[in-house]
Amino acid sequence: MSTISINHVGLLRNPLHGKSKRASINKSWSLCLPRSSSASRLVKPCRVSSKTDTKPAEMTRRSGNYEPSLWDFDFIQSLDNHHPHVKEKQLKREEELIVEVKMLLGTKIEAVKQLELIDDLKNLGLSYFFRDEIKMVLTSIYNNFFENKNNQVGDLYFTALGFRLLRQHGFNVSQEIFDCFKNEKGSDFDETLIGEDTKATLQLYEASFHLREGENTLELARQISTKYLQKKVDEGSINDENLSSWIRHSLDLPLHWRIQRLEARWFLDAYAAREDKNPLIFELTKLDFNIIQATQQEELKEVSRWWNNSRLAEKLPFVRDRVVECYFWAVGLFDGHDYGFQRKVNAAVNILITAIDDVYDVYGTLDELRLFTDVIRRWDTQSIDQLPYYMQLCYLTLYNYVSDLAYNILKDRGINTIPHLHQSWVNTVEAYLKEAEWYESGYAPSLEEYLSIASISIGVIPIVIPLEVSIPNSTFHRRSPFEYHRYDILHLSAMVLRLADDLGTAQYEVETGDVPKAVQCYIKDTNASEEEAREHVRFMIGEVWKELNTAMAESDDCPFTEQGAWAAVNIGRAAQFIYLEGDGHGRFQIHQHMENLFFHPCV
């Protein structure tokens, strides 16, 4: 008799101990239910009935032709970067360096130097150590230079850098601060100002991606700065190699669309190459990188043990085995030492989404998928006998995971989250089923119709909801689980993820058997060329980001906590980076980033 239960593995334990600065905001949650407790009788791990051991007759099935994981279970479990005496020594030195850097932030220096220091700390992933100090410095700079819409400084570099950092930290800075850099007619930026200072043009480019709906000045800034920077790169006229490298990096994706932690090694190496680097900050960056890497390895090992014990990769060989990739996404959503629980929850959800997506996209017949969807709607264990063996395994893994997670939240927060967790999966699999029906019938939807379903099937709802309800101060459980479509931040982050995914994976997925993606739908609607269609999808991503920026600036009505909202937005950021080089699960350069982040310490 086959048993699918994740209760044997304490996935949600927090491995961090020691100083309060590194203590989790959550209590130590474990997925392991005590067998003798009343809770274990209420939410029992489900087992596949013995009468289902006979597997169905063989039939022709599609195959995703997925390659095996680059990092198997044994490799992940062999990671050993967590020596207590070494960590104690590292933490002590880290605390000393933090004190010294705080003194740097408190030193009276030029405002532009203060901004550059803060920008370095953010890019190097250190700003969470200095939140109060950074807020104090930025408040002073805002009051002295940016509160008045009439820019009295006249320095494009300072204005653009300050504008970006202030908007990142929630200050209300008007786009009119850039009006003094426009031509006499005020219709565009003064090209003589833009062309003469490459560093200032780069800062204007980065600032322009914080534009909101209706901010035409920032739209102009984005257009003209992009044109000039691309021209400089094409001509090879940038003599500073470090600056040239940074510009190429930014033209691929601006800072506002990136997640620092996913590229921590790139930013560290870029800082190391600078002649003006601060040795204290450089040492702290390397030290913190190694401490975080040790924590990430422990979390990754826990997630890997849970996945291995589920045995889905063994029993369902058609599903992708992508533990490291799924954890990489989780690191993008929640950075910092306080959110290990959320990272592990998200990694497990990503793994389940990947497996269930393969059931719908690759292996299941349409009749089986309809049965599977109906069982998930019912959310019981009495209906599973009608499912084929492989679907029983998949369903019970999902059912047990959701039940265990809900139990732990109930135990810790005293709230029942099953209705929200369950409905998040119902929404997703119903969208999966609609796409399967389209594929089976050969139906080609319009772009609008496609996105109405594909923005749900991309899986943002079951990603964000468990993260949000696990946050201690969240009140989301008081809302109806049937209102997810009303939340702009969920919808917009899903659109960025879907469109970025389609740019990275569309051709491969259509070739292996899937519904037309955004690119193909636009071609069908407009008779555009493929390059024109891809350019339109890139334009759509930019427009969605305007709406996202607006929604985050007007977050008083947001149903999510600040942490939950940022996690939702970070889904889009992670997607744009991960799909920049390919499909996010395949052979592309993204794997090198994972290697550098998780397996290679800084020396």
Swiss-Prot record:
Pfam families named in the record: Terpene_synth, Terpene_synth_C
Catalytic reactions of this protein: (2E)-geranyl diphosphate + H2O = sabinene hydrate + diphosphate
Domain of life: Eukaryota
Location relative to the cell: Plastid, Chloroplast
Entry keyword Ion transport: no
Motif (DDXXD motif): 357-361
An example Gene Ontology CC term for this record: chloroplast
GO biological process: diterpenoid biosynthetic process
Annotated site, Confers reaction mechanism stereospecificity, chain positions: 350
Cofactor dependence: Mn(2+); Mg(2+)
Residues that hold Mn(2+) 2 according to the record: 357, 361
GO molecular function annotations of the record: magnesium ion binding; protein homodimerization activity; sabinene-hydrate synthase activity; terpene synthase activity
Keywords, sorted A to Z: Chloroplast, Lyase, Magnesium, Manganese, Metal-binding, Plastid, Transit peptide
Protein name (record): Sabinene hydrate synthase, chloroplastic
